[in-house]
Amino acid sequence: MTTPSFTTLAVHQDGAVAHIQLNRPDKSNALNAAMWQEIRAAFEWVDQSPTVRVALLSGAGKNFCAGIDLAMLAGVQQQTAHPDGARSREKLRRLILDLQDCLSSLERCSKPVI
């Protein structure tokens, strides 16, 4: 399997070690929408790659991760807005479940993650 390329993650493989680096140092590696999805894709690649035996997760720059990107969080209300309150809450619930699934990809990964 070839090493994937991402916009918010730097991924490279050295032997049996896959190094996945959060790569938004100008934003203290805050998790934006693209990074959430790329984290899931990167750890699915690690899990499926027969040549990877362990994954190393790190952050570029002086901070590992600042948490959720506040700009993304501010847009959640617009993203989930609906005139029907119940539908709005359901959209929000589905978004939260999707974000949780992205981070759960580390737990689902059959290879050790450091």
Briefly describe each language-model feature range:
Residues 33, 69-70:
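Short amphipathic alpha-helical segments
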Residues 61-66:
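Short, active-site-adjacent cap segments at secondary-structure transitions
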Residues 40, 44, 70-114:
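An acidic, glycine-rich surface segment that forms the CoA-thioester-binding/catalytic face
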Residues 1-60, 86, 90, 97, ...:
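Conserved CoA-thioester-binding segment of acyl-CoA-metabolizing enzymes
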